[in-house]
Amino acid sequence: MVLSAADKTNVKAAWSKVGGNAGEFGAEALERMFLGFPTTKTYFPHFDLSHGSAQVKAHGKKVGDALTLAVGHLDDLPGALSNLSDLHAHKLRVDPVNFKVSPGAGLSTLAVHLPNDFTPAVHASLDKFLSTVSTVLTSKYR
């Protein structure tokens, strides 16, 4: 999926509002994913998955940092996320289907925290961005 110039502008503008909360939003998105898709918990058997756990917060920070990196490299998402794609495909062996459900949790989290900025156009751009990130993260499975 190709991000248009308008999509890139929308994504960057929305992400600038996230600011230093990327880790918190990442943790919240993980919690939403675990609640909505309980099978995703199987990849975290060693985690305390309760609300507000230190492990979920720490992993949420990794998610937020990865998305911040991606926002900074919208013209080269495969290059920017190559190592993360390798990690998930070859070491962690996460089922690629799980990457299809994670964008919804991220979109919900952003909509809750950025209600005034979450216009239909921004929603569509963020959806394309998160779906593209998911596609890139599963690209090494092929």
From Swiss-Prot:
Heme b binds at residue 88. GO terms for cellular component: blood microparticle; haptoglobin-hemoglobin complex; hemoglobin complex. The keyword tRNA-binding does not apply. PROSITE patterns: GLOBIN (PS01033). O2 binds at residue 59. Belongs to the globin family. This is Hemoglobin subunit alpha-1. It comes from Equus grevyi. The lineage of its organism: Eukaryota, Metazoa, Chordata, Craniata, Vertebrata.
